[in-house]
Amino acid sequence: MDPKLLDILACPLTKGPLVLSEDKTELISKQAGLAYPIRDGIPVMLESEARSLNVDERLDK
């Protein structure tokens, strides 16, 4: 994922920052507690496509 794109993108629900997951397959919104998938290099920024973070992921800094 292009770092410039990551700087521009924000969580569609909270308008807060997103963090690229360690395996580079999701964009994480800690504020919303959601992980948005990245498919074929394209972030899918739809709440209906996001998965909820589990407790450990929410607490992970």
UniProtKB/Swiss-Prot annotation:
Domain of life: Bacteria
Signal peptide region: none
Membrane-spanning residues: none
One annotated Gene Ontology cellular component of this protein: cytosol
Gene3D superfamilies: 2.20.25.10
Pfam families: Trm112p
Coiled coil start-end: none
Family: Belongs to the UPF0434 family.
HAMAP family, sorted: UPF0434
The protein's name in its UniProt record: UPF0434 protein PA2980
